[in-house]
Amino acid sequence: ILTYALSALACLTSCSDWLDINHDPNTAEKVDPGYLFNYVAVNWAGTRTGGDFYIPLSMSSQCQVDGGLDYGGWDESVYTISPYSTGNVWKHYYSVGGNNLMLAIKNAEESEPVNHNAIAQCKILLAEHMYEATMLWGDIPFTESWNGTIKYPKFDSQESVLNGVLSLLDEALQLIDLNDANAIDEYDIYYKGDMNKWMTLAKSLKFRTLMVMVDKDPSKAAAIGTLLQAGGMVASAADNLVFPYSTDPGNQNPKYELIELVGGTQILFFASNYMLKPMQERDDPRIPCYFEPGADGVYRGLGNREAAKTDDEENLLSSVVSNYLFRRDAPELIYCCQEQLLLEAEAYARGLGVAQNLSKANELYLKGIREACAFYGVAESDIDTYVTGLPELTTMTQEKALYEIHMQQWIDLMDRPFEEFVQWRRSGTAGNEVPTLQVPEDATSKELIRRWEYSPEEMTANINAPKESPKIWEKLWFDL
């Protein structure tokens, strides 16, 4: 039976305390690698769906808005991100996630026989943890982390960390043995030990990471082309990396629990004009999946910090993010086929490591949109109508085709704000991102947010931390 750690739900507020079951993996007692793996998976999903992560990212990226001070009123809408939030997320990546994955790897290496597949599974999750951390903070501890002989790990450059992520994924791919039944299976909540799926995922995460790096380091295009030609990456919903929540108390999505804390009515997250308007312009069938109509049946978005509209009887006219997305058993989607397919479409449209091919890009683009709509429950007939009505990329200039691909990426990621924040920054050079955002009124910065500041706790505790945290408007290495 899979162990769902109740502590995963503690991240609903900015005052959450994580259980750190081992401070030093080199001195901790032996624990089943599968249990440690599952413990990390549960806490990771809880972090991603909890208030310390979901709220700052959804509000500051402006893929959602708060309806003004009488409704959500989130400080994060104006770029005030609590040090409790940054600290708790940092603790997950290092104390909970990274620390326990390293212990699981150590124990799998020392098992008899060595559990090579378990090591690979843990390395893939570790790679994704470090990818997420560096995409928030840039330079982070990596090469000297989780080493009991190093008290104060140095901060590695983002370029070094992302290359390290690629190395971890390559190591995992080399370790996977499809003929060996020994793997984390019972405790693998994602794929039940199916190493074919883990191999597919590792290739896809490698591709995604290269797509993040290639604008800053064009030499990565060759590796992108190699992966595209070889195939074997995430191609259907069956390959998705997804954490399944349930309707059972204690195993519900923390986003649902957040709404329960305010009486069970979703009035904290509203439709952003930056999201709803492009969807309406394209007659997107996901609109009723993403949003609730106003009391009069009309869908209306809001600007950042704009006050929600009501009628004379105080019924909401502005659209909130749908109850469907905040349901008890809403799954946490970490990586998926639509994200992969739209990235592949982009690669062909740009000619990254392959000949530019708008026809191939269009094929992948339409397939990605189909998968995105299907994931959110759009009826197949409505998907057909929508997709067949979209202009073909082959009729467009390369610039316009890329704009449409990036807009579909933006729309797809509305409820995945971390991925949204990454995608928006990589969608164009500063001032040319898709969509064009404006700095929120009353924001703590005169420029758009491009990163998080470091956890104050880490700044104080680690003498090798930067003396002063970079500001939220300062670009990361990958961000042009």
Question: What are the language-model segments listed below?
Answer:
Residues 1-23:
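Bacterial Sec-dependent N-terminal signal peptides
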Residues 15-67, 73, 95, 109-111, ...:
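Membrane-proximal, proline-rich intrinsically disordered regions
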Residues 31-34, 66-376, 395-402, 408:
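Structured, solvent-exposed acidic/aromatic patches
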Residues 33, 255-281, 287-291, 300, ...:
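Long, intrinsically disordered, low-complexity segments
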Residues 49-50, 374, 378, 414:
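Intrinsically disordered or highly flexible coil/loop and linker segments, enriched in small
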Residues 381-389:
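Surface-exposed intrinsically disordered loops and tails
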